[in-house]
């Protein structure tokens, strides 16, 4: 590697909106994020099921005559 052309690689703290803190190394430094593996629904298993039955019925009613 050439000396003097690479960015400084230093300790970094990543803080999530939920309060989780991750210590790592980065060229960016410390920063915050909105979601992490501690609070993201995919990792926590707390998926939200949306009720879209009304929308589906409205779509079918609107385009019922288009296929005939």
Curated annotation (Swiss-Prot):
Q: Where does this protein hold Zn(2+)?
A: 16, 18, 36, 39
Q: Which SUPFAM superfamilies match?
A: L28p-like
Name a single GO biological process: translation
- Cellular component, GO annotation: ribonucleoprotein complex; ribosome
- What molecular function terms (GO) are annotated for this protein? metal ion binding; rRNA binding; structural constituent of ribosome
What cofactor is this protein dependent on? Zn(2+)
User: Has the keyword NAD been applied to this entry?
Assistant: no
Q: Spell out the InterPro entries in the cross-references.
A: Ribosomal_bL28/bL31-like_sf, Ribosomal_bL31, Ribosomal_bL31_A, Ribosomal_bL31_sf
Q: Which Gene3D superfamilies match?
A: Ribosomal protein L31
What keyword terms does UniProt attach to this protein? Metal-binding, Ribonucleoprotein, Ribosomal protein, RNA-binding, rRNA-binding, Zinc
**UniProt keyword RNA-binding, yes or no:** yes
Comment on bound cofactor: Binds 1 zinc ion per subunit.
PANTHER family associated with the record: 50S RIBOSOMAL PROTEIN L31, CHLOROPLASTIC (PTHR33280), LARGE RIBOSOMAL SUBUNIT PROTEIN BL31A (PTHR33280:SF6)
Give the family this protein belongs to, as stated in its UniProt record: Belongs to the bacterial ribosomal protein bL31 family. Type A subfamily.
Subunit details = Part of the 50S ribosomal subunit.
The protein in question is named Large ribosomal subunit protein bL31
């Amino acid at each position: 590697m050439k000396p003097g052309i690479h960015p400084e690689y230093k300790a970094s703290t990543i803080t999530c909106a939920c309060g989780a803190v991750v210590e790592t190394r980065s060229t960016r430094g410390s920063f915050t994020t909105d979601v992490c593996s501690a609070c993201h629904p995919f990792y926590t298993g707390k998926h939200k099921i949306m009720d879209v039955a009304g929308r589906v019925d409205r779509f079918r009613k609107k385009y019922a005559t288009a296929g005939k």
